[in-house]
């Protein structure tokens, strides 16, 4: 509370205004003492002087005090007995002005602000206020010390609230008790959540299905019970001797079904009664505390139900059930210094409930709000364009380099080429296959245009390195190539195309697979192979040897036995022509 002096003469022994201002009215810890994060406390000490003031010091104290006390009732043997214990568990002091021991200082007239701040650990006890002699409180005390006059003192309470985290199970799990009383009734009593905000209401859902013909439902009583477990010395293992337990009824709701409440169909299977009751919590902490367990003060709540069953034979049975409930203080509902809610309207309470519902994590059934893959922007992804075929390999993964003018392939690295460049090169390759290359173009010029090194094919001379274009089977991997050291695309030699070939007889068409066993037996004796004349850029004429073709075809492993087999198959193919 601010201290203000408006004396007529403005004596030098008085301060015009002295107050403690906090940036936040209360400190909020989310979660238990073992999991809550630290909180920052800051504020200012305000001092206004109309005339100079002589002081010894200006200090600010923050103190945490816990007190546990109970009264035992008096008996015929003697009077009542009181047990109590008070301790200071937290202290912090800020010294703003300290002239020195035994010295004084004169503050000129004016306005003064002294800021202060501190980090409070999340394990600090929360404020417990509402009981007469039992509490946990925090108090600020600011004092201006004077040498020959009374000190100027101002005090201000600090409230620390410990609330639930948005992911706490108490906020998402419903509490229910349901069972069947044989030949009596089937019942279900539930609450939407276990945790309830202080100052709001508790909704209780009832479902009662009579199993005995003629059974009627009588009075239904719902009670909110608060239990107190007080311990003088909680750190002492023998504290069971200094423990006091007490209970009090917070809410007592009595309800009877009207004659208009006829049986209704429940769950499309049975007839019964289904209704809800709302239990309004008190708006002051003096009548209802929050759930807590700190500094020897343990507060718990539970709901107790009693349902009267009027049997057809006239006797009355009673159904009893209990549900646990947890009450916590919400930061959205402010509490004044007298422990009462500042705003007690139903709209404010409903707003606090709605804010809490928005903080809770989404349920599993709400996964349809997740972003779908189809909604992502594909721009920038390395995906071949629409013009590229589904089986088009990347440059570094291709077995054969394209027969197009790609001088940039010499600088090809381990990274794949872009989709647009690949599409452009494939289009140029498709166009180049429809035009015949000039027969006068030399092999060395073609190899240099494609960026193939001259020593790639090994020692060669004249036209002995010429061969026809590899058929589709040339894409098979060669067993003679060490793929661990040869980059992809260079494991198969490149063979240029030659369009004009002079042959006395039609050139046999190479087969893609070996002949059938029956055909091999029916083939007559092989004849000597024919010779074909091939135009060359280096020589006017040369001989085309089928063995050279098989020798340079990629994909056939070397070996003497394999060489004879290939000769036999080629001669058998020529004999069928």
UniProtKB/Swiss-Prot annotation:
GO terms for biological process: regulation of protein ubiquitination; ubiquitin-dependent endocytosis. GO terms for molecular function: protein-macromolecule adaptor activity; ubiquitin protein ligase binding. Keywords: Ubl conjugation pathway. This is Probable HECT-type ubiquitin ligase-interacting protein creD. It comes from Aspergillus terreus (strain NIH 2624 / FGSC A1156). Interacts with hulA. Residues 473-486 have a biased composition (Basic and acidic residues). One of its GO terms (cellular component) is plasma membrane. The lineage of its organism: Eukaryota, Fungi, Dikarya, Ascomycota, Pezizomycotina. The keyword Transport does not apply. Signal peptide: none annotated.
